[in-house]
């Protein structure tokens, strides 16, 4: 009998439980000995710095590989499903914007620099985006210019779609290697959360968690509205009958499993089995379900939008609605890069924050806040993402059957 490898020991186990334990231990240490709690804050700072280091290369490699490996000439029957995926993700981001405007949230961060230069409306933001698009790719990676990174990744990905199979295999293997490094970093999340929570409570008091509770309320509120109101409306638009039997079936049989696995990729077999029982043809489900696990990211769009606007409010920035609408579009695009990576949506926050000229160190601290609330946030996000995959696929299948 072989012993488990070090990597399997490190990456295995229940991450949610370990993060929860780290959160509780950090809070207890801060209440018992605030001085020690401030000292262990270096663990959280190290974790956040690790996230900042991996985020640029992660976005570049995942987007490049995903576009380069996309099959040319996709089945036209998938187009209605893709439309629903894109529409659902954008509607989710827009819902997050509306709730964030209704319930603006500020966060307790370690630092609050006074030298911010917030953009003066949508015109300045568009100008910044255009100039960042043409940044030198190496400089974009070094400076974490995520807009430039995204532009180069998309451009190179399109150019490499007709590359040799060996090139595509290399890109896919490289993406998996980067994802493995990310998993190793994420495996230390319990220690990082322990340090972040301990330092936050010791420095700011337990009241800091009031802001986190409000933030979590906005996040979960947006997800509930999307899952029980907006997704059914989109399904009704497609099948023209009561959408709730199908919606509740998908939430119960796919969402619950995804909530505990916290992985859309791991939930693909569950969705495939459910799609088959719902009458979806295998040739459609075998493509649409894995594709949904990659690009259908309503929960991730909500997370990116809410946390980015919370970062803006924390820095005293008051976004106008036009800017927030642009954020919805950016969040929808960014969310597609969050698939298959633990905490992936959190790592894309710096990209969205760059729209408001929020420094990367502040964005990284917001990522840390995301990990503190991630015990619930990431589970709920995955449940929404994965259940929506099979929901929209089944809805399109039923609509096609009605036409036949």
Curated annotation (Swiss-Prot):
The answer to whether the entry has keyword Membrane is yes
Membrane topology qualifier: Multi-pass membrane protein
The GO terms this record gives for MF are: neutral L-amino acid:sodium symporter activity
Q: List the record's Gene Ontology CC terms alphabetically.
A: plasma membrane
One biological-process term from Gene Ontology? threonine transport
Cellular compartment(s): Cell inner membrane
UniProt KW keywords:
Amino-acid transport, Cell inner membrane, Cell membrane, Membrane, Symport, Transmembrane, Transmembrane helix, Transport
- What catalytic activity is recorded? L-serine(in) + Na(+)(in) = L-serine(out) + Na(+)(out); L-threonine(in) + Na(+)(in) = L-threonine(out) + Na(+)(out)
Membrane-spanning ranges: 12-32, 53-73, 81-101, 140-160, 177-197, 216-236, 287-307, 329-349, 356-376
Known function: Involved in the import of serine and threonine into the cell, with the concomitant import of sodium (symport system).
NCBIfam families (alphabetical): PRK13628.1
Q: Can you tell me which family this protein belongs to?
A: Belongs to the dicarboxylate/amino acid:cation symporter (DAACS) (TC 2.A.23) family.
Please report the name of this protein according to its UniProt entry: Serine/threonine transporter SstT
């Amino acid at each position: 009998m072989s012993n488990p490898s070090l990597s399997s020991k490190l990456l295995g186990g229940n991450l949610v439980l370990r993060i929860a334990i780290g959160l509780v231990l950090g809070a207890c240490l801060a209440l018992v000995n605030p001085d020690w709690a401030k000292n262990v804050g270096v663990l959280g700072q190290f974790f956040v710095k690790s996230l900042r280091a991996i985020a640029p290369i992660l976005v570049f490699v995942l987007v490049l590989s995903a576009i380069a490996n996309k099959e040319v000439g996709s089945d036209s029957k998938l187009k209605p499903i893709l439309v629903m995926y894109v529409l659902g993700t954008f509607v989710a981001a827009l819902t997050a914007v509306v709730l964030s405007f209704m319930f603006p949230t500020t966060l307790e961060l370690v630092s609050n620099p006074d030298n911010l230069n917030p953009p003066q409306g949508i015109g300045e933001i568009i100008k910044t985006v255009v100039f960042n698009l043409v940044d030198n790719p190496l400089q974009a990676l070094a400076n974490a210019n995520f807009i430039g990174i995204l532009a180069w990744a998309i451009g190179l990905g399109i150019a490499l779609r007709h590359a040799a199979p060996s090139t595509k295999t290399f890109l896919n293997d490289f993406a998996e290697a980067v994802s493995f490094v990310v998993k190793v970093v994420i495996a230390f999340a319990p220690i990082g959360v322990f340090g972040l929570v301990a330092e936050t409570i010791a420095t700011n008091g337990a009241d800091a968690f009031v802001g986190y509770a409000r933030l979590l309320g906005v996040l979960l509120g947006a997800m509930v509205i999307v899952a029980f109101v907006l997704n059914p409306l989109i399904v009704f638009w497609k099948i023209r009958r009561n959408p709730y039997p199908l919606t509740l079936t998908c939430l119960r049989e796919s969402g619950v499993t995804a909530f505990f696995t916290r992985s859309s990729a791991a939930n693909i077999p569950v969705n495939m089995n459910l799609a088959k029982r719902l009458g979806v043809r295998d040739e459609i489900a075998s493509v649409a379900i894995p594709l949904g696990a990659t690009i259908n990211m309503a929960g991730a769009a909500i997370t990116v939008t809410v946390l980015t606007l919370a970062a803006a409010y924390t820095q005293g920035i008051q976004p106008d609605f036009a800017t927030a609408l642009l954020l919805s579009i950016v969040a929808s695009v960014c969310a597609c890069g969050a698939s298959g990576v633990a905490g992936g949506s959190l790592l894309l926050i710096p990209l969205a924050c760059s729209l408001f000229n929020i420094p990367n160190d502040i964005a990284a601290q917001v990522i840390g806040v995301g990990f503190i609330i991630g015990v619930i946030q990431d589970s709920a996000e995955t449940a929404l993402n994965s259940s929506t995959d099979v929901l929209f696929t089944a809805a399109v299948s039923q609509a096609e059957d009605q036409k036949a």
